[in-house]
Amino acid sequence: MNNILSEEVLNVTDFTTSRQLTLWKREDLQSPQLDDVAEEVPVALVYNGISHVVMMASPKDLTHFAMGFSLSEGIIDSPREIYGMDVVPSCNGLEVQIDLSSRRFMGLKARRRALAGRTGCGVCGVEQLNDIGKPVQPLPFSQTFNLGNLDRALKHLNDFQPTGKLTGCTHAAAWVMPSGELAGGHEDVGRHVALDKLLGRRATEGEEWRQGAALVSSRASYEMVQKSAMCGVEILFAVSAATTLAVDVAERCNLTLVGFCKPGRATIYTHPQRLIAD
């Protein structure tokens, strides 16, 4: 199989389609013209030949997505438990064919669920309400972050949204180093998928990705908190608000959750002791 870190595509226009549409401005209905629209395709994650989940996603960075999903859903504990991946066309979408260790595959089969997700929806397909939420080990308090450095990260977050700049239709997730510099980031039409891509990337990067925090351009849902905690992320910044369930989950698993992140301000929901106000 191909190396799990291989890039599927390089050109941002591979993720957009030109469609004819009509723009409206007050007192000015313009003639039809071409504009860029973000691609959204079904992506199936296939473990050892068995399809486990279908998510709607942007068709790029899919090996990172598969790695992040596998980690954040507890399918694996380590990237070493995935031996390889291939991204291949399938029907009306794409498949990520994943070579999973035998031990992990047996565990996956024991708790397999059939998911036909909406855009990055992680609850779709869960059979019972009791199945929502996974046990997460409480996080340690090993990280700190100076809020004075957050402005720098916010300023450059959209650098990782080239498709979003063309279409206005993607979410971003980026890794913020303690200095406020962004180590890297990913975009997707689904906010959960964007975060999974980031978590998958982080799992295979070097030491500079161990310190810092995750930053997302969207609101913070309970699942984004849970995914972050499952991957050992202690601090999650969100540009928009957090839900009540997200706050409850963050409190229980010792994750520092911060929303409404804007230059010079933020709302700290849980565990402020990791944050330095400078």
UniProtKB/Swiss-Prot annotation:
One of its GO terms (cellular component) is cytoplasm. One of its GO terms (biological process) is Mo-molybdopterin cofactor biosynthetic process. Pfam families: FdhD-NarQ. Mo-bis(molybdopterin guanine dinucleotide) binds at residues 260-265. The keyword Cytoplasm applies. Gene3D superfamilies: 3.10.20.10, Cytidine Deaminase, domain 2. Keywords: Cytoplasm, Molybdenum cofactor biosynthesis. GO terms for molecular function: sulfur carrier activity; sulfurtransferase activity. It comes from the Bacteria. It is found in: Cytoplasm. Required for formate dehydrogenase (FDH) activity. Acts as a sulfur carrier protein that transfers sulfur from IscS to the molybdenum cofactor prior to its insertion into FDH. This is Sulfur carrier protein FdhD. It comes from Salmonella agona (strain SL483).
